[in-house]
Amino acid sequence: MSDWQRRHILSLADFSPVEYEMVLRTAAGFAEVLQRRNKKVPTLQGQVVTTLFFEPSTRTRSSFELAAKRLSADTINFAASSSSLSKGETILDTARTYLAMGSDIMVVRHAQAGVPQAIAREMERLGTEVRVLNAGDGQHEHPSQALLDLFTICSVIQPEQPSLGAIAGKKIAIVGDILHSRVARSNIWSLTAAGAEVHLAAPPTLLPPEFAQFANTPIPGSGLPRQLQIHWQLESALENADFVMTLRLQQERMSQSLLPSLREYHREFGLTRDRLRVCQPSVKLLHPGPVNRGVELSSDLMEDESISLIQPQVTNGVAVRMALLYLIGAAVPAAIPA
C-alpha cells in the first residue's frame, strides 16, 4: 500500500487518525478474505517473518504466525527457552542471527520495555530493510492488541465498513490492572485518537494519578485533546458506558501488597451482570485474555455472546495482524502483489 509511510510499528503514541483508518480498511479486506474457502493470498510470498518471543505467549504468537502464513510468508519461530540466550548470547546478537537467515519482518515480544525499539534501531544501523513489529514490551505497549480491539469495536457499530468515526463520542471503560497493562496504554492512545471518551477504573494501587497525563498529549494529525478520566470506584466509570474492557490481574508483575485479595478485588471491581445494568442497554464486553474467571468477570458474562466480544477479538486478531504485516511488508518491493 503506497500511502503507508511507517517502517516499524512500535507504539501507537504517535499514530495519526489517517494511519488508524488505513489499518481498519486493510483489516476489513483481510477479514473478508478469511471468510473464503481459500484463505491464503500471495501478498508476502517470498518474505520471511520471524517471531522473536522472549516472553511466553499463546494467543499473540499463534495469531501472528497464522497471519503470516495466510499472507504466504515463510515463518521462523524463536523460543527463548531453547535458544542461545541461556548460553550468554545477547538479544541484539540473536536478532542479527535471524537477520543473517534472511528475515524481512521481526515480530518481537519481551518482558522488558524498549526491546523492540532497540532491535529496530539495530536493523537501521546495519542498513537493512528489516521491519520490526512490537508484539508487547514490558508494561510499555501492545499495539496489535489495541488495534484489534479498535477494529472489533468499530465492526460492532459499522459491520460493513469499520471506520474510526464510528466510536467518536462513545464511552469506553477500561477496568482492571491498568498499572501493569501494556494493553491499557496502547488502547488509551488508539481509543482517544478515535474520539472516544475513555474512562479508567481500578483500585488506587493499580491506577496511579499519573495516567491522567496521557490526556496532555494531543492527537497526532489533528492536535485535538484526548478525552480521558480516572475513576477509583467502578460504578461511575460504567455509567452509560457503550463498551467495557476488563483487564487481567497480572499477578506475575505485581507485589502481593497491591491488593488485599482476589476475592476483595472481585467484590469491588469484578464485572457481573448486575453491575453492567448502569451501562447502555447495548453494552459490549471485551477482554484481551487470558481471563481469570470469577476474578475480572463472571463466567456467565464471558460466555454470553450477546454481550461478550472475547471470541470476535481473537478472530479479528488474525485479520488485523495480516493488515499490519502487509502494511509494513508492502514497502519491501518483493511483497507488493502483481
Curated annotation (Swiss-Prot):
Binding site for L-aspartate: 87, 182, 248
GO biological process: 'de novo' pyrimidine nucleobase biosynthetic process; 'de novo' UMP biosynthetic process; amino acid metabolic process
Residues engaged in binding carbamoyl phosphate: 59-60, 109, 142, 145, 289-290
Cited InterPro entries: Asp/Orn_carbamoyltranf_P-bd, Asp/Orn_carbamoylTrfase, Asp/Orn_carbamoylTrfase_sf, Asp_carbamoyltransf, Asp_carbamoyltransf_Asp/Orn-bd
Record Pfam families: OTCace (PF00185), OTCace_N (PF02729)
UniProt superkingdom: Bacteria
E.C. designation(s): 2.1.3.2
Pathway: Pyrimidine metabolism; UMP biosynthesis via de novo pathway; (S)-dihydroorotate from bicarbonate: step 2/3
GO-annotated molecular function: amino acid binding; aspartate carbamoyltransferase activity
Cellular component, GO annotation: cytosol
Keywords per UniProt: Pyrimidine biosynthesis, Transferase
The keyword Transmembrane appears for this protein: no
Protein's job: Catalyzes the condensation of carbamoyl phosphate and aspartate to form carbamoyl aspartate and inorganic phosphate, the committed step in the de novo pyrimidine nucleotide biosynthesis pathway.
HAMAP family to which the protein is assigned, alphabetical: Asp_carb_tr
The protein's assembly and partners: Heterododecamer (2C3:3R2) of six catalytic PyrB chains organized as two trimers (C3), and six regulatory PyrI chains organized as three dimers (R2).
Assigned protein family: Belongs to the aspartate/ornithine carbamoyltransferase superfamily. ATCase family.
Name of this protein: Aspartate carbamoyltransferase catalytic subunit
Biological classification of the source: Bacteria, Bacillati, Cyanobacteriota, Cyanophyceae, Synechococcales
